[in-house]
Amino acid sequence: MASKLSFKRMDSIAETMPDALRQSRYQMKRCFQRYVSKGKRLLKNQQLMEELEKSLDDKVEKEKLVEGFLGYIICSTQEAVVLPPFVAFAVRMNPGIWEYVKVHSDDLSVEGITPSEYLKFKETLYDEKWAKDDNSLEVDFGALDLSTPHLTLPSSIGNGLQFVSKFMSSKLGGKPESMKPLLDYLLTLNYRGEKLMINDTIDTVSKLQTALLLAEVFVSGLPKYTPYLKFEQRFQEWGLERGWGDTAERCKETLNCLSEVLQAPDPTNMEKFFSRVPSIFNIVIFSIHGYFGQEKVLGLPDTGGQVVYILDQVRAMEEELLQRIKQQGLHVTPKILVLTRLIPDAKGTKCNVELEPVENTKYSHILRVPFKTEDGKDLRQWVSRFDIYPYLERYAQDSCAKILDILEGKPDLIIGNYTDGNLVASLLSNKLCVTQGTIAHALEKTKYEDSDVKWREMDQKYHFSCQFTADMISMNTSDFIITSTYQEIAGSKEKPGQYEHHYAFTMPGLCRYATGINVFDPKFNIAAPGADQSIYFPFTQKQKRLTDLHPQIDELLYSKDDTDEHIGYLADRNKPIIFSMARLDKVKNITGLVEWYGQNKKLRDLVNLVVVAGLLDASQSKDREEIEEINKMHNLMDRYQLKGQIRWIKAQTDRVRNGELYRCIADTKGAFVQPALYEAFGLTVIEAMNCGLPTFATNQGGPAEIIIDGVSGFHVNPINDREAGIKIADFFQKCKEDPSYWNKVSTAGLQRICECYTWKIYATRVLNMGSTYSFWKTLNKEERQAKQRYLQIFYNVQYRNLAKAMARAGDQQARQTTTGVAPSEIVVRPKERKPQTRMQRILTRLAGQKPPVSE
């Protein structure tokens, strides 16, 4: 419909809507009367469209109106507030682009309104007194970003690193003196006091250019593999220090790259140069809630994919750091610390071990710091992620002291995960003046409908007042934000993204966010994770195959007996297998896949179906939604008489065996299907494609970006059962007629993964962000300082009081059980006290100071 319209971005709805209303005045009067007839209310998009269609009797007129400009506006409206005689619309014409208008239902007059005015309108439905109070708390973070360049095109959202390089090139271009900020930044580079790249003798841009020219001419005359040590003394004579490269060739490339930047900066050279700058050696990653460990933790409360993500992330980042440091010609040992909570009651895990090496790394560790009760004792038991907020400020201070001790100084980059980790990362990055990145994983505001305006109803259980406040602080404090997909940031044409939902919203009685976060901010970046390629590798790599697991997998797939681990059987084991693996809930839609299969006779004749999901017995589950889905699975198997064609296996947590299971499915020339109603990213899609399985995945969410439909896999519409079943059946029919087609899709899927979805690509991109944004923040120092003061005030007057008002759930549980901590229950890292500099002692003292009391 949108393609038929001549609506331009420059035309505001407030300007164009009146003419459109006049052209269909009679019909729209009827429509708006229907809107206001039931009094004050909030209408969602579907309700708006239904009321519009009900107000039109003539079929031709209805089609004309719905397909026209007014229909387009209403179709693009995410919600509307009805306060008779007015209806206020929140219209989203494109990802990230919102406009608010108010229409009088009697005379159809239209008035453009601000986000703040719209939110006040909306608040009237929930707390009229607060909405009318001129002194209600209103926050506008966008007002402090007016001088910061922003993206303008929806298609550019998520490409922050690329555009920051363009902005920096523009700002530094022109006169030589405009390069002074870059020179000043290079002069700050050091590792434990040892200068890197240049020393203080180079104090002007012209001196730097001369030194670069002399050095480049010199190394050009050397054999390209000449080690740096052979010519280090000559470099120092010109004011150049270590960090340019490990060989003559590498040094020449870096010297030339900086010379090009100084001569005429362009985004490509700018990005390339900062990828080589030796600015990141020590990284701290926060993941606080749940049971963070390397074994026996998955499935425990608040513990899941985030743990797997971070452990894979750490391995990839350490490997990339080691390679960079070597290529920079440095002899430096990098360190990565994953900060999480120490839990004395560890439930058989290692969550009571203070310092634990990360497996398959050399210099990375998990550092666990305990929560403290109000009387200063270690909190023994797990605390829900929703009840964690009163502990975080003290946790940040205790963590800071530990970090400075172990790293013997400040980290170079801090990355937060989820609300709690992001808030603590914000506190420490501000305190230590360190570059900060954040990763949401999930934003709870988008999971619970109307959880902002109805926060009071949910606050006792979820404490969204604290959580949403913390999210706003960390989003706006962060130097860069890492996301997995475009849709996570800005959604699709029809649906806002998770971050976009935080653009303008209100929590009546608490706070109104006239601007929360703008998805056009260049801090947003897409860096998709990969799958662990030591586990998920192609089925064709026979020498790596885990053949000792094949008897177990054969039993899992083909044994005829029902057990507590699997039910159903496959009568014809020569058929290819359709495979799926996910949680057993409504959104993951495993029962939907079973229905697609059951309804399609052709598909059933061609292939078997194997699903790995949830529990098999509803009496063993405590999750209401899972119980419903278990019962539905049994009903579908009976209704479609799937005996002999389906195998249902309960959830599997052994990642190594799961990797070989994918490959065994590929051996049957089968396919993987991800049928979710919505999937934010789709890690199982990456895993399956890594193993060489042709993959069908939902077109709702991240998988639509991972797969190029019809080339590297296939999109399926999870709402259209018949269409989805036909699409899968057609693929297998084509493979039956032309066996090479299966190989073609499998190979294209592997190529897609290698080009876009590996941890190597991820680590390279994130470290480039850390290096580039470190300089970017120095270019915008004054604007950042103003915003940081604003955020500090907001933290102190809002978040602190909300967290203080929360009951400390963990403290209450501790009082009900036992007090004190048995020393033998906590494994403490042996102390190796190292001499501290005076500055380190000062920083450590500061890190350990108690939080000020707020009345």
From Swiss-Prot:
Lineage of producing organism: Eukaryota, Viridiplantae, Streptophyta, Embryophyta, Tracheophyta
EC number: 2.4.1.13
Name recorded for this polypeptide: Sucrose synthase 5
Gene it is expressed from: SUS5
SUPFAM superfamilies: UDP-Glycosyltransferase/glycogen phosphorylase
Catalysed reactions, as listed in the record: an NDP-alpha-D-glucose + D-fructose = a ribonucleoside 5'-diphosphate + sucrose + H(+)
Membrane-topology descriptor: Peripheral membrane protein
Region annotated GT-B glycosyltransferase, chain positions: 279-758
Localization in the cell: Cytoplasm; Membrane
Main location: cytoplasm
Species whose genome carries this gene: Oryza sativa subsp. japonica
Task performed by this protein: Sucrose-cleaving enzyme that provides UDP-glucose and fructose for various metabolic pathways.
